[in-house]
Amino acid sequence: MALGLLAGCSSVPLERSAMQPAQLLPLATLAPPVCAYRLDAVSDRRAAGTAAGSLGAHAFSLDDAADLVRQRLMANGFRDDPALPALSLEIRQLYIAANQSSKVPVAVYRVSVDGGPPTILRSHAASVNWNGTEAESQRAIARALDDVDLQLRQMLDARCGSRHAAD
């Protein structure tokens, strides 16, 4: 009897896998920006290194988050023109966590424009945890990145509008 109870306490080992950047590209295309910005620097400052959380029996890693975010932002209208205002971006967190009923993908950026004071942007993309599959996890991270990228665009567009009003 005791052996049967102990067997029920064993856990399934986590399947370790790397998130695929092709699965994390923008799910939605943003409207063109109000005014242009240069993507000066993207750095990966995640305290967890390449670890990107877990969902169900899957534990994830993401090796080159800075390149992924750079690709996503360049696809959404950032430029390499040195005459434009410069955006510096640090990736502070990028992972997925879950409980029985919901999954919480987290993306946190620390951004500054032209060396100004930094702003923290955090995704708000929690959703129902259906099956805990690898594909579901990657879609959730892509949605979190879409959310924080949209917040960044809105912040920059508002800054651009106030900059033009001062002219």
Q: Where are the regions a protein language model picked out?
A:
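A structural "domain/chain start" motif
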Residues: C9-D67, D157-D167
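Sec-dependent bacterial lipoprotein signal peptides
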Residues: M1-S10
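Short alpha-helical linear motifs
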Residues: D40-D44, Y109-S112, L145-D149
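Sec/Tat-exported extracytoplasmic proteins
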Residues: V69-G77, Y95-A98, L152, L156-C160
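Surface-exposed short loop/turn segments
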Residues: S10-R16, A75-T119, S123-A135
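Short secondary-structure boundary motifs at beta->alpha junctions and helix caps
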Residues: A47-A59, G116-H164
